[in-house]
Amino acid sequence: MADLSQVTPVAFNCEGGLVLNRSTFMMKPGEALELQNFEPDIEGGYRRINGFSKYVSAVVPQTSASTEKVLMVCTFASKVVAARGTNIFTADAGGSSWTTVDSGRTSAGKYSFERFNFDGNDKLIVADGTNAPTVFNTSFSATDVSSGGGGEVSTAVTGAKFVTAFKEHMFYAGMSSAKQELVFSVPFDEDNFATNSGAGTIKVDDEITGLKVFREDLFIFCQNRIFKLSGTSTSNFAITAVTRDIGCINGDTIQEFAGDLIFLGPDGLRTVAGTARI
């Protein structure tokens, strides 16, 4: 056990920076009422932003209308990847133009994505909630993922909203025709769903709103429940309920923070550990 006999607590006040809860007559020297071009300093307080430059000088191209939203931004293979309208584009950092690497993604929604390496080659998989999930290699050659063929799982992964790699399988969820179902590929092959080779499906009793791998488990967030999948393959995959009383209303809020998972529940931000004790 550590010797704490020479350790004494020290109390100090966190002062300075932006103060909005005091009258200007009560503010001390060094406290600010309004800050422009400042950001939090990693050493405490605030620091002035000395300047900035655009990562890519050109805007992501529109495909049909200027009102189209940018639906995804990520980095892969030393490039910036962005989705807007019906297309996916790439650009070099510091570049001034975008290159189309995939098109025809009709009615695409907000994307989820996963970087992975199952066969010694880095890949990026994206899912938009409407079209087939698409895999890119480092040359940005696109391959659509499909399931439901002979000898494969019957549930098609086209229209998946969520995609994540777990225990060498690729997991898909959020299909409009199977909102309560989780589909996983065979080991080390994101586009193979042969049931006799290790692919399969898992059903829960609520609509899935997000997936997150945390430590050795895959957490399945639903509207009113949270489940946990453990194991490594079809032979020992096991699903247990974390809670059947509270769910996640927005899968984009699921984040790892301070050794736990946080998410937005119906009553605000919650931790999985705290929710499991309810």
Feature roles, as predicted:
Residues 99-104, 143-149, 194-197, 237-243, ...:
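Beta-propeller fold detector
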